[in-house]
């Protein structure tokens, strides 16, 4: 069994973006909840290992014998739960993910994508019932309330007076939204 060096989160995100990593048709669909995504990021922020990924290198000559799918980038509970089929024409060897799809998809959704799930007390056929949520991370310090440290929120969240107080006290919810778009900024710069 061959072992590779550790992957960086940045390289995983870039490889998903460039479609270097694809999912074989034998993979189940993305099923993680927002709480599971938050726990993954909690583990990362506490420097816990998140286990290994299992890759399957498929030579381009064999790739046409299989079906492959792309990663979900913006999960939507009603209209975006299925992975789009990958166009593999003109592609070199394919790196298929056999184990780690839930974690990789969660990393992508948490850092660049979004997660839309139905708001309670709204009709399933109402498009407004599925606000798009992004992950906000407190990378500057400890929160007094651990439930506020990581959370997938939609933009209407801070409209109530109670949530305005939280926003003022924990301003990093909004401020860190775009931090991962800048490659030259690192977590250590803020510590």
Give the location of each predicted region.
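Basic- and aromatic-enriched surface patches that contact anionic nucleotides/nucleic acids
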Residues: 2-34, 38-191
